[in-house]
């Protein structure tokens, strides 16, 4: 890459040496443990650093990828060019009135637990969702009958050119696993959840029940991206895959889970190519058997 050393030094000036990695294998930073190298991986510690990195990206015309905690993404084996940013240091969670405010890099499960500790109800559904707050907003994450849309008040974002703005719930076009931000690629910095006072014991009982359901049904013992496919109208993706006889099948180190057919696991050092080939096998087979097109919930990014 042209100016690679210069770009690295500028990134170090902005974020500090410990927060900038070069040629970093992204399999170290995704929950599925798959992914080629990123040219530069940066972890800003302040909103100002986020803005400065964005301006640097603009100055050099670099490709840019924002990654949450790597839970809902497959990075191809060729990796990611330019700058990859994770906001793991921006992870504060606090309360103002009945609102819980969280920075983008906080774990959505941690926000759910914080709400419980504060005797606030509304985020129980998120107690088992693997992902960052920013990722949860982008995907309008949901589970067990609840979704982000139900409790979101507003978000603070940075545009890709480095401008700050506030967007209200109704401006975010939150739908089933989609949002305006998933199309504009604005960077979520801070989120305000509007919750209600509740009974601690009742909130905890609901969270315990949802956690039990999740642990008993999902293959949490292996790396995965979580739920691979969106729910097709009138069907359940996992049931279609199960009825297609695909459990235990796959390519290379990737395999359709025998515990929950909606999950594809990294059973043995799978590559992105293995994982994507397994996805395509599932889609093709389900289409042939049932005439249903399975749409991806997971994002596939990076170079071949």
Curated annotation (Swiss-Prot):
FAD-binding PCMH-type domain sequence ranges: 34-198
Pathway: Cell wall biogenesis; peptidoglycan biosynthesis
Cofactors: FAD
Location of this chain's protein in the cell: Cytoplasm
Domain of life of the organism encoding this protein: Bacteria
Gene3D superfamilies: 3.30.465.10, UDP-N-acetylenolpyruvoylglucosamine reductase, C-terminal domain, Uridine Diphospho-n-acetylenolpyruvylglucosamine Reductase, domain 2
GO molecular function, one term: UDP-N-acetylmuramate dehydrogenase activity
Family: Belongs to the MurB family.
Classification via PANTHER family: UDP-N-ACETYLENOLPYRUVOYLGLUCOSAMINE REDUCTASE
Protein name listed in UniProt: UDP-N-acetylenolpyruvoylglucosamine reductase
Species this chain originates from: Geobacillus kaustophilus (strain HTA426)
UniProt gene name: murB
């Amino acid at each position: 890459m042209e100016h690679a050393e210069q770009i690295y030094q500028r990134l170090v000036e902005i974020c500090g040496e410990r927060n900038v990695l070069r040629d970093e294998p992204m399999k170290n930073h995704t929950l599925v443990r798959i992914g080629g190298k990123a040219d530069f991986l940066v972890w800003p510690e302040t909103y100002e650093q986020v803005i400065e990195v964005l301006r640097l990206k603009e100055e050099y015309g670099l490709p840019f990828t924002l990654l949450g905690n790597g839970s809902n993404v497959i990075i191809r084996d060729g990796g990611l060019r330019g700058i990859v940013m994770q906001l793991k240091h921006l992870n504060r969670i606090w309360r103002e009135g009945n609102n819980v405010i969280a920075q983008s890099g906080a774990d959505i499960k941690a926000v759910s637990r914080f709400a419980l500790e504060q005797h606030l109800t509304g985020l129980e559904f998120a107690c088992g969702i693997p992902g960052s707050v920013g990722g949860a907003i982008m995907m309008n994450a949901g589970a067990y009958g609840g979704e982000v849309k139900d409790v979101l008040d507003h978000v603070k974002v940075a545009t890709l050119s480095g401008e700050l703005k506030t967007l209200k719930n109704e401006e975010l076009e939150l739908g089933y696993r989609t949002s305006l931000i998933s199309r504009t690629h604005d960077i979520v910095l801070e989120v305000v959840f509007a919750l209600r006072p509740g009974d601690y014991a009742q909130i905890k009982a609901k969270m315990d029940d949802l956690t039990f359901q999740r642990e008993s049904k999902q293959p949490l013992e292996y790396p995965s991206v979580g739920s691979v496919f969106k729910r097709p109208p009138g069907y359940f993706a996992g049931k279609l895959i199960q009825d297609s006889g695909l459990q235990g099948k796959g390519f290379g180190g990737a395999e359709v889970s025998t515990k929950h057919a909606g999950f594809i696991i990294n059973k043995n050092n799978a590559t992105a190519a293995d994982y994507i080939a397994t996805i395509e096998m599932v889609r093709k087979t389900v289409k042939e058997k049932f005439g249903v097109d399975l749409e991806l919930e997971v994002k596939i990014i990076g170079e071949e």
